[in-house]
Amino acid sequence: MNKWGVGLTLLLASTSVLAKDIQLLNVSYDPTRELYEQYNKAFSAHWKQETGDNVVIRQSHGGSGKQATSVINGIEADVVTLALAYDVDAIAERGRIDKNWITRLPDNSAPYTSTIVFLVRKGNPKQIHDWNDLVKPGVSVITPNPKSSGGARWNYLAAWGYALHHNNNDQAKAQDFVKALFKNVEVLDSGARGSTNTFVERGIGDVLIAWENEALLATNELGKDKFEIVTPSESILAEPTVSVVDKVVEKKDTKAVAEAYLKYLYSPEGQEIAAKNYYRPRDADVAKKYESVFPKLKLFTIDEEFGGWTKAQKTHFSNGGTFDQISKR
């Protein structure tokens, strides 16, 4: 071997020695499996190109509230990508995430959004068109349990907000409306993907209250000949949020790559992947490209209608809150 060959061999050997093998754990909520399977591959390629290091991202999925509890109880997540800010706040309250986490990334650390829609069987046999149709006698509703599922809490508050707007902001009438809706719920799964499987795979229920991305996935991937989406007249702006888990990344020395992993969600490639997986992108150019996918509807926010997640959680989903009250048969 000539001296150039020897030199190249040594250079390649030294490069491989210097390259790190890094593992991250992303603890996420229920229906983000497909999104992060694609995104993880893209980020790994990006990080390899930028640094030469190999990064493998493992995923964990479940109801957002249950996932937050697992991180509180010690699972070593480098990042969390959860359904709502309250679940990240709960981890921060235990000291595992900085309490100012929501200010660390743009758009209140919510790189994409969604909303709540209805999935019905082809032909819409029960003629479901808006929230008021879900309380009619004989309509079987599928939604997850708000005690464990972030998506279910968005579902619940979307229904409550609709009822407020149609009853002069009367809270008692809104509670009666949501109680009537939940009387029609046939199965309460622990997470959003479980509810989708109940409706799609097991054939139970007339209507699934769902994340928009789940409804689009079900129709586009599982058969437009079997299901159709009903977009209600109004719904809630759902903002899934993300954060590094400070205590874990400091311990594992993965802070730089974990932060880059979340920041890359805001990049054009990250936003494109979000849109392809039926999440509403924040990036204006990407949003324009996919505007035909996402119908326009009146959206209200958690802050406008419920005073933010801390107040909403206490009022509706804490022990003895409105969900417990309406659940008493």
What is the predicted role of each segment?
Residues 1-7:
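Bacterial N-terminal signal peptides that target proteins for export
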Residues 14-16:
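N-terminal signal peptide c-region/cleavage motif recognized by signal peptidases
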Residues 19-94, 104-105, 211:
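Early extracytoplasmic/lumenal segment of secretory-pathway proteins
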Residues 91-106, 217-231:
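Ligand-binding "clamshell"
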Residues 92-165:
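A conserved helix-loop-strand patch within extracytoplasmic ligand-binding domains
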Residues 116-124, 239-256, 273-277:
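A bilobed periplasmic-binding-protein/Venus flytrap-type ligand-binding module shared by bacterial periplasmic
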Residues 166-233:
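Ligand-binding pocket segment of bilobal, Venus flytrap-like solute-binding proteins
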Residues 249-329:
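Extracellular/periplasmic juxtamembrane helices and adjacent flexible linkers that interface
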